[in-house]
Amino acid sequence: MTKGLKIVTIGGGSSYTPELVEGFIKRYDELPVRELWLVDIPEGEEKLNIVGTLAKRMVEKAGVPIDIHLTLDRRKALKDADFVTTQFRVGLLQARAKDERIPLKYGVIGQETNGPGGLFKGLRTIPVILEIAKDIEELCPNAWLVNFTNPAGMVTEALLRYSNLKKVVGLCNVPIGIKMGVAKALDVDVDRVEVQFAGLNHMVFGLDVFLDGVSVKEQVIEAMGDPKNAMTMKNISGAEWEPDFLKALNVIPCGYHRYYFKTKEMLEHELEASQTEGTRAEVVQKVEKELFELYKDPNLAIKPPQLEKRGGAYYSDAACNLISSIYNDKHDIQPVNTINNGAIASIPDDSAVEVNCVMTKTGPKPIAVGDLPVSVRGLVQQIKSFERVAAEAAVTGDYQTALLAMTINPLVPSDTVAKQILDEMLEAHKAYLPQFFNKIEA
């Protein structure tokens, strides 16, 4: 009998963790997780203890022999791990709220993974994940790193280009959400639907859609023009598309494309929300407070349905399916973030792309799509340039590189506004950006 798997989740005190635990419980027969180590930082210790105790109740109720370990010692947890998943947030939700509110002051989209907010989440996150990568290299060099931390594309880009790890996969729930949305719009079972995904994280397109192997792209594009088929996420306003624009685009956009193709409407929605219910981070803080109160209930031993309000639908499906496919060498097709290696012709070979891959025990094998359609190619290339420059800024702490990244992002209207936002956000996040400030003060 083979020994069970050791999985380490960094950011284990996350409100999403019960969904991950549920995923491992459901798949125990094909994915024998023996140890699940939930790791967090001292500021997250209370949440870690609450969610970890719930996780223990869940595995006990399910009758599966998964040992749950809770720790603040990352290195202790990582020793001899088989898989490491990352789902942490540097600066917690308070930092996200600043990422959302500060750009709005300048009339710019304030969002977790797009525009200035996405840049600053990357600047805070990348140095931390590169330190984690060094620990993995030393303590569990054969482990797969499965990154869920946003901005997942930029973070995967940095891991591929600035760490020595080769076993790296970036993961997102957006493609699964699109697939579910397509099935709902067509009123069919999701297992009958396949989508040809290609692009970048939160910048992924469905180049074609198949129902029972037959293309139904035109039918899906027609359905997306109907407001009842918004196909968006909890965290993104479902502003209505112009049906003629979708037909001209001739691919399936994801919810995040509204920030680029409907910037005016999305900005208006954000400004209004910031004056009423609050920014998305502020809404999530309230949702999380409610969730952790539920998690404390000693009689709760399942994932509560209220977790779906948090916006991470299908998170565990994406993560557990990926880990199971690598472990079992399934050779099934999943959309993940991985090194391009020519899969998308107009993106550098050494960059991270989000594309359908055949999942094997040696990792994802991207399915080449050639060039992206001219209708979306330029935007994808522009965002990839932004991600590459942003990753460089995160690693070097160079002010001018950060200003370049901010300015070339298509959601930022001028170099002057870029500098104003950059300066204010650098100061606001100073505690989490030592690479910029230690240099200045040295």
Swiss-Prot record:
<dbReference type="Pfam" id="PF11975">
    <property type="entry name" value="Glyco_hydro_4C"/>
</dbReference>
<dbReference type="InterPro" id="IPR036291">
    <property type="entry name" value="NAD(P)-bd_dom_sf"/>
</dbReference>
<feature type="binding site">
    <location>
        <begin position="5"/>
        <end position="73"/>
    </location>
    <ligand>
        <name>NAD(+)</name>
    </ligand>
</feature>
<dbReference type="GO" id="GO:0008706">
    <property type="term" value="F:6-phospho-beta-glucosidase activity"/>
</dbReference>
<comment type="function">
    <text>Hydrolyzes phospho-beta-glucosides.</text>
</comment>
<keyword id="KW-0378">Hydrolase</keyword>
<protein>
    <recommendedName>
        <fullName>Probable 6-phospho-beta-glucosidase</fullName>
        <ecNumber>3.2.1.86</ecNumber>
    </recommendedName>
</protein>
<feature type="active site" description="Proton acceptor">
    <location>
        <position position="256"/>
    </location>
</feature>
<dbReference type="InterPro" id="IPR001088">
    <property type="entry name" value="Glyco_hydro_4"/>
</dbReference>
<keyword id="KW-0479">Metal-binding</keyword>
<dbReference type="GO" id="GO:0046872">
    <property type="term" value="F:metal ion binding"/>
</dbReference>
<keyword id="KW-0520">NAD</keyword>
<keyword id="KW-0119">Carbohydrate metabolism</keyword>
<dbReference type="InterPro" id="IPR019802">
    <property type="entry name" value="GlycHydrolase_4_CS"/>
</dbReference>
<dbReference type="GO" id="GO:0005975">
    <property type="term" value="P:carbohydrate metabolic process"/>
</dbReference>
<dbReference type="InterPro" id="IPR015955">
    <property type="entry name" value="Lactate_DH/Glyco_Ohase_4_C"/>
</dbReference>
<feature type="site" description="Increases basicity of active site Tyr">
    <location>
        <position position="112"/>
    </location>
</feature>
<feature type="binding site">
    <location>
        <position position="96"/>
    </location>
    <ligand>
        <name>substrate</name>
    </ligand>
</feature>
<keyword id="KW-0326">Glycosidase</keyword>
<feature type="binding site">
    <location>
        <position position="202"/>
    </location>
    <ligand>
        <name>Mn(2+)</name>
    </ligand>
</feature>
<feature type="binding site">
    <location>
        <position position="172"/>
    </location>
    <ligand>
        <name>Mn(2+)</name>
    </ligand>
</feature>
<feature type="binding site">
    <location>
        <position position="150"/>
    </location>
    <ligand>
        <name>substrate</name>
    </ligand>
</feature>
<dbReference type="InterPro" id="IPR022616">
    <property type="entry name" value="Glyco_hydro_4_C"/>
</dbReference>
<comment type="similarity">
    <text>Belongs to the glycosyl hydrolase 4 family.</text>
</comment>
<dbReference type="GO" id="GO:0005829">
    <property type="term" value="C:cytosol"/>
</dbReference>
<keyword id="KW-0464">Manganese</keyword>
<dbReference type="GO" id="GO:0016616">
    <property type="term" value="F:oxidoreductase activity, acting on the CH-OH group of donors, NAD or NADP as acceptor"/>
</dbReference>
<dbReference type="Pfam" id="PF02056">
    <property type="entry name" value="Glyco_hydro_4"/>
</dbReference>
<dbReference type="GO" id="GO:0004553">
    <property type="term" value="F:hydrolase activity, hydrolyzing O-glycosyl compounds"/>
</dbReference>
